[in-house]
Amino acid sequence: MKMNKIAICFALIFGTCLAVEAQNTKFIGKNDPDAKKVLDALSAKLNSYKAVQANFMLKVEDSKGKLQGSRSGVIYLKGNKYHISVVGGQEIYCDGKDVYTYDKSSNEVTITKNDPTTQTISPDKLFTNFYDKDYLYKLNGEDKLGARTVEEVELTPVDKTKSFFKVVLYIDKVTHALVSMKVFDKGGNRYTMDTSKINGAATFTDAELAYNKAKFPGAEEVDLRN
C-alpha cells in the first residue's frame, strides 16, 4: 500500500464503514448549505483541539469490493505539523514545509514538499475550511456506524485531473468528530480510514513530530522537492 494514500485518506485523520452511493443530485454543480453546516462544525471541533493523537485503520478495496490490504497506526497532529506511525515500520513526518516518508522495507526516506495549494486532504488541512475552495460538497443524509449516528458528506474535487473523484466523510452527528473517511480513485479502488481513541488534549513536543535522520541509520534519502 502506497504511503501517500494514508495522507490522502486521513487526514489521516476525525466502526465499519458503510459504502453508500450518493443518490441526491440536487446540488451537483453547487454547494449544499446543509453540508457546509456539518463541515463547519467539524472544522470548529478540530480547531478546539490543541494537539491530537488518534488511532486509525486504513483498508484498501478494489472495484469489486475485494480487500487488497489494511494498515493500522497512530497519528500525532499539532497545527500544520504531524507524525504518522504505521504498524510495520513506516513513518511519515511533516514539519509544515516538507514531508518525510520512511519505508522500513527499503530503508529509504522520500522527501517531498508540503504543498498547501493541492487538493489532497492532508492531516493539517482538516483544521481549515479547505472544502470551500477545493471541493463541491453535498449532504447525503444520515447513517449508522455501529451505535453512532453519522452525517454523510460527499466531496467532489474541483480539479478533475486529480487521481480521485470522490471523498465521503462520516461525521458524528452529536460530537461533530470525524469517524471515517472513504476515498474513491479513478482506478476503481476505495480507501477507507476509520479513527478511534481520539485525544484532543494530547501532550507531545514539536521534536517528536520532526524527522530526525539519526533515527534511521543508513537510510537512503530520495529528495523530490525540486
Describe the role of every protein-language-model region.
Residues 114-149:
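Flexible, surface-exposed loop/linker segments and immediately adjacent secondary-structure boundaries
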Residues 22, 135-140, 144-225:
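Gly/Pro-enriched, hydrophobic low-complexity segments
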Residues 18-67, 80-81, 215, 220-226:
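N-terminal leader/targeting segments and the immediate start of mature chains
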Residues 1-25:
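Bacterial Sec-dependent N-terminal signal peptides
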Residues 58-60, 86-87, 182-185:
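Beta-turn initiation residues at beta-strand->coil junctions
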Residues 36-39, 43, 96, 124, ...:
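Extracytoplasmic/secreted envelope proteins and their assembly/folding machinery
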Residues 74-120, 191-192:
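An acidic-aromatic
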